[in-house]
Amino acid sequence: MIALHFGAGNIGRGFIGALLCKSGYDVVFADVNDAVINELNDKGRYTVEMADAGRKQETIGPVRAINSATQLDELYDLIAKADLVTTAVGPAVLKLIAEPIAEGLKRRMKINKQPLNIIACENMIGGSAHLREEIFARLTETERAAISDSVGFPNSAVDRIVPIQHHDDPLKVTVEPFFEWAVDQTEFAGKVPDIEGVTYVADLAPFIERKLFTVNTGHAMAAYAGYKKGLKTIKDAIHHPEVRQTVAGALEETGRYLVQTYDFTQEEHRAYMTKIIGRFENECLSDDVTRVARSPLRKLGRDDRLVGPARKLCDLGFEPVRLAEGIALALQFDCADDPEAVQLQSMIAEKGYAGVLRDVCGLEEDHSLFKLVISHLKA
């Protein structure tokens, strides 16, 4: 069985690629980083280390890699022959890999009618569906019809913290022991594959929103609040009383939405929330505040981790005070080393907070959340 995985970064190697290898797949990584590609091909394996007191290590392999920008013919052949395609490239890169995947699928339709599933394992809602749209935009109507018959794009929700790495071995990757990979079993073409560690579900929405509005929201809240306090790491931030109160308050708010919307009980969600805060406290996982806070324009999007749950709470008649505080803190993130932070501050200087709340967050001045955020900015 061949699994082609786009993205040989830390998530690709330390999470998705590792599980695919352990499930019996011959894993081929597609990336554009020649240094990593050459290392993977030279060694054929790599080490994954658990970020806990035990520091357990396991060797993952055999694997190989190709350059998805320069080895296009080989890439198309792999797509034509693969039993599974996965991605962990970041939401913004999906549109860049859509073109070669589309070309590979055209080749596949000529030689291989076996079902294929393409799973985007990204920090976004509907990643596989989005990738499908990008791919289909590059196909004719006839090609789309042919591919729809045998290619599935199951959406997934992934969760595993991979801290910043400090290893002499460029392939070694440290990951937290906890992980969650949930995949919508109703969206597969053909047989659902047996992948170690995957949870197959009939309704993915609760898992996606629980993860996005707890892990991602909590991480972002800790980062932006920690940055405002001049703290360096997430561990430092979550141990700061005021920051911890801010994070816990935001997760109480998102929890209210999740419990009211889905079948999670209050006790079940509180246990999950406690587990997530415990992950932030793991000193083996401690990440730089500025790294977690980076890309504020994306994270301030109307459906993302801060504005998304806050808007939903407003729709339910609740006032998301802590989430509004988080949005205000994100708007003040001015790290000079982050291009999006620089762009954000330039936008604020040009059009003010009101303009950014409208154009980036999708909030008009008469929205209750708009007013809440402005009140925090004036405080």
UniProtKB/Swiss-Prot annotation:
Keywords: NAD, Oxidoreductase
GO cellular component term, pick one: cytosol
Reaction equations catalysed: D-mannitol 1-phosphate + NAD(+) = beta-D-fructose 6-phosphate + NADH + H(+)
Alphabetized GO MF terms: mannitol-1-phosphate 5-dehydrogenase activity
List of residues binding NAD(+): 3-14
InterPro entries found in the cross-reference section: 6-PGluconate_DH-like_C_sf, 6PGD_dom2, Mannitol_1_phos_5_DH, Mannitol_DH, Mannitol_DH_C, Mannitol_DH_CS, Mannitol_DH_N, NAD(P)-bd_dom_sf
E.C. designation(s): 1.1.1.17
GO biological process: mannitol catabolic process
NCBIfam families in alphabetical order: PRK02318.1-2, PRK02318.1-3, PRK02318.2-1, PRK02318.2-5
Entry similarity comment: Belongs to the mannitol dehydrogenase family.
Protein name, entry field: Mannitol-1-phosphate 5-dehydrogenase
Organism: Bacillus licheniformis (strain ATCC 14580 / DSM 13 / JCM 2505 / CCUG 7422 / NBRC 12200 / NCIMB 9375 / NCTC 10341 / NRRL NRS-1264 / Gibson 46)
